[in-house]
């Protein structure tokens, strides 16, 4: 989506970056050791902040930080991070005596955090914060790494060479959880296996807020560069699996353990496509209409009626839904948990507030990006002006002004870099908003499971009442015939059998509904706790970076102001 814009920006800034690099080398500034190719990552900021429900993580060059700075120990020995630090020994000694600046305390340990925590990239820690379980804060751990994508050929014969290829990813799991029966596992999986895992979890854990899986974007796979698309999918899959293992219930599921441990082909039952489900439902429908199928199976009622497997059940639940909304009679059972209904409304309101905050975060990132780019362009413009002044200089005063202009250009370029670093950190911290927007979809799915289970209970109760009324009428009619009506007696026996099956299904459906209610409440309480912690960390990190980089930028311009103070004395 942003490919053409990225190419354009990289072309526009390539010459500027070379000039910037050369200019700073002349000045001997320690920042020449840092990465100056930040514009490529800048082009990804807009995409990262505007894609609200996309599970991909932006390719950001995180320059100084990989973890929450407020929990990092201060370091007083950084030479290249503070504008006050000098390469000579005397100033290094004075740095022990002076109290460190806020920027020194906040940013000096950043480069070492990833090594301490064993993080392999800058994106892993922010993605792990979402759906954090209490056990993740203890000594127990489970770490997922997705790497080494490979193209493989389908086993089936194809007339088109290379026409049936797919990408597999190596998924490595390291854990000390005893339930997994080992400490390290490595398997290869394709995207279809991810879809199967997500479907099995959705069936087995109704009422839970299961993190949404990445979408299979056919369009982007055709438009984007193949290597870029594969890398984005790899990051998205890693982020998804890390969220699953962070869930306190899903992490112990048999489905996830099989997915992470079973070698070879995934032994989970594959997902049935919509066409096959519709065909199965069409085959069963005539038998159900003629009464050969009996009542609803107690095994099937624990799954939602939608999907096409059981047309008759779909029609019955649709009729019940219409009757609930437009009928004059009250349903046999209704949602009476007022506290839950209030919480449900608050969750919907929360989603709207997060959407609004996300839009403002996008605007902030764009403004910071524009500020950094403009400041860099200003510095490069003064570089050219300095070169002109030096070439045309005749008097020493002209050369002095050219030197001051060079210092101004250097400061503008440094400030531009700090804005880029700040923007990178802003994206990392405020990306929590977009993660929670995706999680709101899972919350809605959990609430939909509850509504679907309630509708199934209502439908079965209505059906049971109708069957009992029919059986009672047949018994009354049969009692009026001397000796009994054999055909009616047979129908009564069939109805009683259907009533028994429906009664069992109703009991199973009620138990399923009660279980989903418990799951909903436990998930809502868990999300409330984790949201408070995640949002607090987000705000702490965001504010700390704003303050730290503001001080860095202020120090840059303070140095320029001190060096040019002589002009004030001359004018006075």
From Swiss-Prot:
Domain PX: 147-266
CDD domains in UniProt: BAR_SNX, PX_SNX_like
InterPro entries: AH/BAR_dom_sf (IPR027267), PX_dom (IPR001683), PX_dom_sf (IPR036871), SNX2A/B (IPR044279), Vps5_C (IPR015404)
Binding positions for a 1,2-diacyl-sn-glycero-3-phospho-(1D-myo-inositol-3-phosphate) per the UniProt entry: 190, 216, 233
Domain BAR: 318-572
GO biological process, one term: developmental process
Keywords: Cytoplasm, Endosome, Golgi apparatus, Lipid-binding, Membrane, Phosphoprotein, Protein transport, Transport
Phosphoserine modification, residue list: 133
Tissue: Ubiquitously expressed.
Mutant lacking the gene: phenotype: Reduced rosette size and inflorescence length as well as root gravitropism defects in snx2a and snx2b double mutant.
Name this polypeptide is given: Sorting nexin 2B
Species, as recorded: Arabidopsis thaliana
